[in-house]
Curated annotation (Swiss-Prot):
Its main location: membrane. GO terms for cellular component: plasma membrane. HAMAP family: SecD_B. Keywords: Cell inner membrane, Cell membrane, Membrane, Protein transport, Translocation, Transmembrane, Transmembrane helix, Transport. GO terms for molecular function: protein-transporting ATPase activity. One of its GO terms (biological process) is protein targeting. PANTHER family: PROTEIN TRANSLOCASE SUBUNIT SECD (PTHR30081:SF1), PROTEIN-EXPORT MEMBRANE PROTEIN SEC (PTHR30081). Forms a complex with SecF. Part of the essential Sec protein translocation apparatus which comprises SecA, SecYEG and auxiliary proteins SecDF. Other proteins may also be involved. Pfam families: Sec_GG, SecD_1st, SecD_SecF_C, SecDF_P1_head. Disulfide bonds: none annotated. This is Protein translocase subunit SecD. It comes from Rhodothermus marinus (strain ATCC 43812 / DSM 4252 / R-10) (Rhodothermus obamensis). Belongs to the SecD/SecF family. SecD subfamily.
Length: 622
């Protein structure tokens, strides 16, 4: 054994190292089993008393992927078209047409949106300059800048927007409290987010998708808004008779402002023929343009986007919905106010220095915000100049509240009210503290795995590993006798090494990762098969067992090493360019290759040398 002293030392050191890294996983699993046997009261008391230990074990334990413990996998895409529009300092009809055409080209082809935008712009007018729309001296874009310089500026801004979005989303997820999230860039404008253990998908969607564009705006002049409402209703009247009927309906709506009337609960003898009144209840007073049921908002938006209808609205006014329902109709559908709000933004969320959840005198949640000195100065001027008027607090283009200013507010404090729950208030605080996304993001792919499905995946994965291990072990013993038993022992150590490597590098075990372990079991046995066959060939030529073992390992090494190193490089490529499940498979495959090479070449050789040289036994390899 002296000749193998170093190998034995390395093997024992690796086993101890694997034991060190796997100990938290084993202890955490036993602790989870213990907690599952406790009652709710006992569990709560135990967690409170041992919170530090439990948290430490959770952080050091081998992590399970979404497919094993449940959670959400979301792919986000940054809206580059919205970023381009925001970067533009001058937007006209030509700009919108070019952007729309570029959007269609980018959606149907391989060209990027920015390249398509520049090409479409130059196709329409080869002599025109993009700098007309994107003049920004601070960024080096002047009216003399070439289209190539503007395109480079847009690409740089798009890349920075994606990177900034990743930072903001990571901060939001951290504040949400997800353990071991995975957030990474995919391609040029996509972001992959994996959130293990989340159980409220809708809340997560709001958290990820919200741009957190907080704005303070003045409301429309009530008289001008209601006059525009009458004009728009008249525009959609099918004939003169219907217009007269609509006038009567509007007069009734103006006179009856009870809650039942506002929520559309008054009886109606027949469905109005006016397409707008069919999906919107006009209020006829104040800053409320109308009341719309949730499912009808898309139809109302389509009717109001008509350019001729937009021209009837007061200049500088747009219509925004309230964030939360104001009631329900007779069918139980949520109803929302459609409000007239000025487009001009008086203050943004950039002046907010602190946000926190508080409760009013009726114990309703609200978000209290504190502004910096500059924001407080503007807020004092804004409130002082608009006493008796509404100021809308707009977050991501929906109105959370529009309080009436009673007096000048010099303290720089404001609040978002009308929230449904503490969780909603906390989510708003989270996005405000994390900052606004540089551009809107869309969820283009979403997968949710429930905890029960994750448990089923764990059971299926363990069953596949144990079944594969048992079948391979039985075959090796049956075919290679003592040599097969040695290979089986090395196989068990191989699995311990794989799990130890994953735990040491803080990797995540996924269902494809378990598939990689099963594949590695076969590859490890394949290496032993090559060695044993070479030993049998040498014995067939009359070599002694000791000489046959030496030559068998020597001749099989090159084939084993070449095959494994090639597979390792393939796994490395998969890890570099893949995402999610592919990376999980690649990680365990690379760990398995390293472990199987060591166990097949080193560990089995130590055991052979011990049995043949030390114990002088005749070991059979079939």
């Amino acid at each position: 054994m002296k000749r193998n002293g170093f190998k034995i030392g390395v093997t024992l050191a690796l086993l101890l190292l694997c034991g060190y890294y796997l100990y938290p996983t084993v202890r955490y699993a036993l602790l989870q089993r213990k907690l599952n046997r406790m009652s709710e009261e006992e569990r709560a008391a135990f967690i409170e008393a041992n919170y530090g230990t439990i948290q430490s074990l959770r952080e050091r334990a081998l992590k399970l992927g979404l497919d094993l413990q449940g959670g959400m996998h979301v792919t986000l895409e940054v809206r580059v078209d919205a970023l381009i529009r925001e970067l533009a300092t001058d937007v006209d009809e030509t700009f919108e047409e070019v952007l729309a055409a570029a959007r269609e080209r980018a959606r149907s082809g391989d060209v990027s949106l920015i390249d398509a935008f520049v090409e479409e712009f130059e196709r329409r007018d080869p002599n025109a300059r993009l700098s007309r729309y994107f003049r920004n001296p601070d960024a080096g874009i002047t009216r003399r800048s070439s289209n190539e310089e503007v395109a480079a500026y847009l690409r740089q801004q798009a890349e920075e927007a994606v990177n900034r979005a990743i930072e903001i989303i990571r901060d939001r997820v951290d504040r949400y409290g997800v353990t071991e999230p995975v957030i990474q860039k995919q391609g040029t404008r996509r972001i992959v987010v994996e959130l293990p253990g989340v159980d409220d998908p809708e809340r997560v969607r709001r958290l990820l998708r919200g741009t957190a564009r907080l704005e303070f705006r003045l409301m429309a002049d009530p008289q001008l808004l209601q006059a525009a409402l009458q004009d728009i209703i008249a525009y959609y009247e099918p004939d003169t008779t219907a217009a007269s009927e609509t006038s009567a309906v509007t007069d009734t709506a103006t006179a009856d402002t009870s809650l039942a009337a506002l929520l559309g609960e008054q009886p109606s003898p027949e469905r109005p023929r006016n397409p707008l009144l069919a999906v919107m209840q006009p209020v006829g007073q104040g800053v409320v343009f109308g009341i719309v049921a949730g499912p009808d908002t898309a139809q109302v938006n389509r009717l109001l986007r008509n350019p001729e209808v937009q021209a009837l609205l007061p200049s500088g006014i747009e219509l925004l919905y309230t964030a939360n329902p104001v009631g329900t109709d007779e069918q139980g559908r949520p109803l929302y106010y459609l409000l007239g709000v000025r487009k001009e933004v008086e203050l943004t969320g950039e002046v907010i220095t602190d946000a926190r959840v508080e409760f009013d005198e009726l114990n309703r949640p609200q978000v209290s915000m504190t502004m910096n000195s500059e924001g407080a100065r503007i807020w004092a001027r804004l409130t002082g100049a608009n006493v008796g008027k509404h100021i809308a607090i707009v977050l991501d283009n929906v109105v959370y509240s529009y309080p009436v200013v009673n007096e000048r507010i010099p303290s720089g404090r404001s609040s978002i009210t009308g929230l449904d729950s503490r969780e909603e208030a906390q989510d708003i605080v989270t996005v405000l503290k994390s900052g606004a996304l540089p551009a809107p993001v869309d969820i283009i792919e979403e997968r949710t795995v429930g905890p029960s499905l994750g448990e089923a995946s764990i059971r299926a994965g363990l069953r596949s590993v144990l079944t594969g291990l048992l079948l391979v072990a039985l075959f090796m013993i049956f075919y290679y006798r003592t040599g097969g038993m040695i290979a089986d022992l090395a196989l068990v150590l191989n699995i311990i090494f794989i799990l130890g490597i994953l735990a040491a590098f803080n990797a995540t075990l996924t269902l494809p990762g378990i598939a990689g372990i099963v594949l590695t079991i076969g590859m490890a046995v394949d290496a032993n098969v090559l060695i044993f066959e070479r030993i049998r060939e040498e014995q067939a030529t009359g070599k002694t067992l000791r000489a046959a073992i030496d030559l068998g390992y020597s001749k099989a090494f090159s084939a084993i090493f070449d095959a494994n190193i090639t597979t390792f490089f393939t796994a490395a490529i998969l890890y570099s360019f893949g995402v999610g499940p592919i990376q999980g498979f690649a990680v365990t495959l690379m760990a398995g290759i390293a472990a199987s090479l060591f166990s097949a070449i080193v560990i089995t050789r130590i055991i052979f040398d011990y049995l043949v040289l030390e114990r002088k036994l005749m070991v059979s390899v079939g």
